Every structure is written in structure tokens, then in C-alpha cells.
């Protein structure tokens, strides 16, 4: 019954075909019984993960300033290998042809092209300027103030996914409690928020008077960002020499 079986995995426009010929090599016979070597199932799923997982991989990002930068971070596709091995074992036991997506521990925006798609928040830490693109259209840009470099709170670069968004949060740390209207964390305790205690943003403020790592934004910009972001939206932070206080093109 395995000889004519076909299981097709789809990842966007890409396909992986597991056919009877390959399944046949996973079988063993004992006492007139056919059994499947489960380690072969796990190995196959592991090979899918190493081919299609994008989390923590390096990828290029074309900045709004023109040049490309390389970013990596926890954002990206990640196959749930344990869950998928169990699902594949079940599909094989049923002996039916199946076309399916693998089980994911984490999803991204796209399988084709860049996994971050065309809706994301772009954060130029050098220029202290950010953008939000929605389906390729720029809907927001704003100066900001990031982590205080002189105190060792430099905001790290990387590609992340927004964790959640919350109104009226109080951000607490050692020796401070800051009430904010809009809170949007994306990298552990680092997130975007309004900063009513500041009246200037951008430039080189961050070097000596920056935040504890968060992206401090003007109220109106934080509000617009809050209204348009969602859990999982890509947040791409980078440094780009030559754009200090630079204008976006």
C-alpha cells in the first residue's frame, strides 16, 4: 500500500514530494509484519527543516536609503519537527495521498522571495529614523531615540517579530516606571512606545541621553504605528554607516 503513496509538502510555490519509492526504504519486515522506522520519519522532517527554516538565517534587506544590509534574528519560518514527525507518521498509517503544509512552530510572511514580505517596520539605528511599509507602500516615517550608547543600552540590530501590542502600559526597570499610551515589544523587553517626557527625537540624542534600549517615538507617530502593526509583523533594525542624520531617499 505504500508503493503508490505520495505526500506533497507545499511551502509557497515550492514543493517537496515524498513518494512510495522513498517510503519503501523506511520499511522493515518482521514476523510477517511491516513496520516503519520512525527514525527515518524524523530524519526526513529534519531535512525539511534545514532546507526551509529561515529563522536565524542571514538575509539581505534593501533599505529605504538605497544600500542593502544583512540582517538575522529570530524572525522567520520554523518547522515544528516533533509535531510534523507525528503528523507524517499518522499520514503514512492512513496510507492516503496528502498535500499539506508542515506544522510550524513559527510562521513568517512569505515563502517566496524575502520571508519578511512587504509589510514591515524598518528601523535605521544609525539615522535614528524609522519607516512602516504596508503592502509595499510607505505609510509612516518618524525620528526616534533608541538605547543610550554611553550607558551600554545600545539597541541591537536584527530581524524580529512584534510580540504583541498594548495600550496604557507601565514600563518598569531598575529605578524607573514609565507610563506609556502605546507599547509594542519586539525583542524581549525592547519595543516601540511613545515618550511624553521627550520633546525632541532623532539626531544623536541616543548616544548620551538615549533609552534603556527601547525605541522612543513622538506620540502621533507611535499612535499611527500602533494602529497598523500586529503580532508577528517583521521589525527590521540595522546600522548603516553614512546615514547619520541622513535623509531617506
Model-derived regions: residue spans:
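Surface-exposed, secretory/extracytoplasmic low-complexity segments enriched in Ser/Thr/Asn/Gly/Pro
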Residues: 1-177, 182, 229-231, 236-242, ...
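Active-site scaffold segments
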Residues: 183-237
Amino acid at each position: 500500500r505504500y508503493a503508490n503513496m505520495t505526500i506533497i509538502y507545499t511551502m509557497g510555490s515550492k514543493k517537496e514530494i515524498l513518494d512510495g519509492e522513498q517510503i519503501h526504504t523506511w520499511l522493515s519486515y518482521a514476523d510477517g509484519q511491516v513496520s516503519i522506522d520512525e527514525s527515518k520519519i524524523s530524519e526526513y522532517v529534519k531535512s525539511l527543516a534545514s532546507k526551509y527554516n529561515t529563522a536565524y538565517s542571514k538575509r539581505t534587506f534593501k533599505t529605504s536609503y538605497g544600500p542593502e544590509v544583512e540582517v538575522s534574528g529570530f524572525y522567520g519560518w520554523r518547522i515544528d519537527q516533533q509535531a510534523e514527525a507525528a503528523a507524517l507518521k499518522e499520514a503514512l498509517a492512513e496510507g492516503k495521498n496528502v498535500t499539506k503544509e508542515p506544522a510550524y512552530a513559527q510562521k513568517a510572511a512569505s515563502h517566496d522571495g524575502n520571508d519578511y514580505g512587504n509589510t514591515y517596520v524598518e528601523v535605521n539605528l544609525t539615522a535614528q529614523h524609522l519607516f512602516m511599509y504596508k503592502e509595499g507602500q510607505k505609510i509612516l516615517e518618524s525620528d526616534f531615540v533608541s538605547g543610550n550608547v554611553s550607558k551600554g543600552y545600545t539597541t541591537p540590530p536584527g530581524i524580529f517579530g512584534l510580540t504583541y501590542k498594548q495600550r496604557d502600559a507601565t514600563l518598569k526597570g531598575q529605578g524607573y516606571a514609565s507610563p506609556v499610551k502605546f507599547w509594542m515589544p519586539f525583542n524581549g523587553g525592547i519595543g516601540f512606545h511613545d515618550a511624553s517626557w521627550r520633546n525632541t527625537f532623532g539626531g544623536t540624542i541616543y548616544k548620551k541621553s538615549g533609552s534603556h534600549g527601547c525605541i522612543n517615538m513622538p506620540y502621533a507617530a507611535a499612535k499611527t504605528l500602533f494602529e497598523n502593526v500586529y503580532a508577528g509583523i517583521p521589525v527590521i533594525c540595522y546600522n548603516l554607516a553614512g546615514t547619520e542624520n541622513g535623509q531617506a531617499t
